[in-house]
Amino acid sequence: MNIKDQIKQILNRFSIGDYDYVLIKLKQLSKKNPYNSYLKNLLGSTYLKVNDIESAMINFKLSLQLDPKNVAAINNLANTYKNSNNYQEAERLYLKALEFNPNYVSGLLNYSNLKINLNNVDEAIDLLQKAITIEPDNYMLHFSLGVAYQSIGKFKETKKHAEKTLEINPLFSPADKLISSYIKYTDDNQHFIKMKKDINNQAINDNNKVHIHFALGKAFEDIGINDEAIYHIEKGNNLKRSLIKYDINDDINLMKRIKLMFRDVDFRKNNFVINNEKMIFVLGMPRSGTSLVEQILSSHSNVFGAGELPFLRNIILNNFKENQNQPKDILHTVSNLEIMSKAYIDKTSLLENNNKLILDKSPLNFLWIGFIKALFPNAKIIHVNRDPKDTCFSCYKNLFANSLNFTYQKKELALFYNAYSDLINFWNEKLHSFIYSIKYEDLINNPNKNIKNLLKFCELDFE
């Protein structure tokens, strides 16, 4: 079998997710063809699929040593840096790939995703629109453009491009889920009828059927057929849970470790003045009202709503891994705190924030409140809480874009909520004056009073 046929066979196995087989065959083929840039790039892509980031980067770089103008390898290396939150290096590489080939659609798409991460949505939209002029029937470009418009509240454009996605690829169900957010369904709605057919379509894989189940749950709820709504919510959650690897004990043990780390820390005696930067962290359980609080505060002329930033979590978890045996060293060594603080500031400095006060709305930052106090003593922390049953049910009936894996099984969701509640109580005992707690229901029922109190806590003038 010649190399072309071997690669074709390998790509077929890659497409069905048989990555162990692909790695074995690619290593063998690459050994026989050590100067083949394409093989090194494909090997790197396969390592990415099995989450071996280091090996992926090595092979992408080897591919580029063999062929510095291999735009696919440049693009893949840029994606790896982007996923590792090294946005500066990722941007440099995307620009390099597009310099070699200005019409490289994958590069335009991935660079647009980086721009969205950096809250530069207008530039992301420009990149996607350019890509669509090159490949007008590329359904992923239309879907990505719809998501970009969604992030800036242009819902008419979102729906238009989601519908175009399905026109090109009727089986791409994430577009169904996106459309469902903007329709108040009736039983004769054509999209509703389409989804009822699609759920029994054997050509649609389980990952896509998850999206249809959640969309149908919302549709049946709109129509008022609650038994069917619950059925599809249950099916969607069960199917999603079967497709992910997750152990609730990992999260619970992490929260226990955090409490142990901070148990004997007296913040009144420890002067962690590492950074004088002012910023706002809005946190709590997902679906507790954090988005509403962010919308209110980011409408202020001096506040920049940065969305859910991954930076703090990644920086702290990296230090956890490096200090597994003596986690308290993270706190007790000033140099560690300075490195972590600088890393966060460096990441947020890339955002297009016009020198405004940055608001980080990652709900799960409740895990890191003690770290925030140590790293940024002038920060403002707002904890949003909501009725536990309402919070958990809202989590359960929503499909999340990010990895909130505890939300797809009722028992795991309850265990996570209890651990969250315990940790928040711990932080309130330790750092009561540092945390402003607000109830979602109070904000809804008495907005004027609560908005004024929020602004006062953040030291912002009423506008």
Go through each PLM region and give its residues.
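PAPS-dependent sulfotransferase catalytic core
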Residues: 225-340
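Conserved alpha-helical positions within TPR/SEL1-like repeat arrays
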Residues: 11, 38-49, 72-83, 105-117, ...
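PAPS-dependent sulfotransferase catalytic domain
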Residues: 152, 166, 303-306, 311-334, ...
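Register position in tetratricopeptide repeats
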Residues: 15, 49, 83, 117-118, ...
